[in-house]
Amino acid sequence: MRQIFSHEYRAQWRDMDFNQHMANAAYLDYAANTRMLFLDSVGFTAATFAERGLGPVILEDRLVYRREIRMLETFTVDYQATASTADGRRFKLRNRFTSATQDLCATVDSIGLWFDLVARRPIIPPDDLQEAFARLARSDDYEEWDAPPR
């Protein structure tokens, strides 16, 4: 069964910028952390990736702001798939940041691929990783790519 994975956080002092709201780098950090928490939850820990010599590589992030997140505010980051190639080699993912009152604060759309850390090249992910990723919910605008966008 597909699930939207989510995790709750609290904005910290180190996340703030000069304007007293969460800095853009913090959004990207929380998006990456949520992605890794999902992978960990389906059995792909950091140690698993290291042992198998593979990992995800993000090629592009697109961050869109809707509402500020301020210091000590609680927020949730969810995670879903928005596109992939049929072989699973490349993918597009979306993280949505929502406030405690369910207001959409930001979205991060990320394009990535699976990478062989020894050969230093993109790879088709192993079957068990593809099966784990298949548990992730797909967005309403999900698309399957014949070839990834350039």
What are the language-model segments listed below?
Residues 1-41, 100, 150:
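Catalytic strand-loop segment that frames the active site of acyl-thioester-processing enzymes
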Residues 3-7, 69-74, 82-150:
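HotDog/MaoC-like acyl-thioester-processing domains
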Residues 34, 42, 136-140:
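Alpha-helix boundary/capping residues
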Residues 20, 79, 120:
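Hydrophobic pocket/interface hotspot
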